[in-house]
């Protein structure tokens, strides 16, 4: 699985994990949790 191609899903947990998604032009970072 190419993790950079996954959608940006922030989730419902109270943790804070760094994740990546493809924003249409580049692989971008977001915080999950």
UniProtKB/Swiss-Prot annotation:
Gene Ontology MF term list: potassium channel regulator activity; serine-type endopeptidase inhibitor activity; toxin activity
GO cellular component, one term: extracellular region
Annotated transmembrane regions: none
UniProt keyword terms in alphabetical order: Protease inhibitor, Secreted, Serine protease inhibitor
Cell compartment(s), UniProt: Secreted
Main localization (coarse): secreted
One Pfam match: Kunitz_BPTI
A GO BP entry: envenomation resulting in negative regulation of voltage-gated potassium channel activity in another organism
Secreted in keyword set: yes
Family per similarity comment: Belongs to the venom Kunitz-type family. 02 (native) subfamily.
Function per UniProt: Serine protease inhibitor that inhibits trypsin at a molar ratio of 1:1.
Annotated protein name in UniProt: Kunitz-type serine protease inhibitor hainantoxin F7-25.66
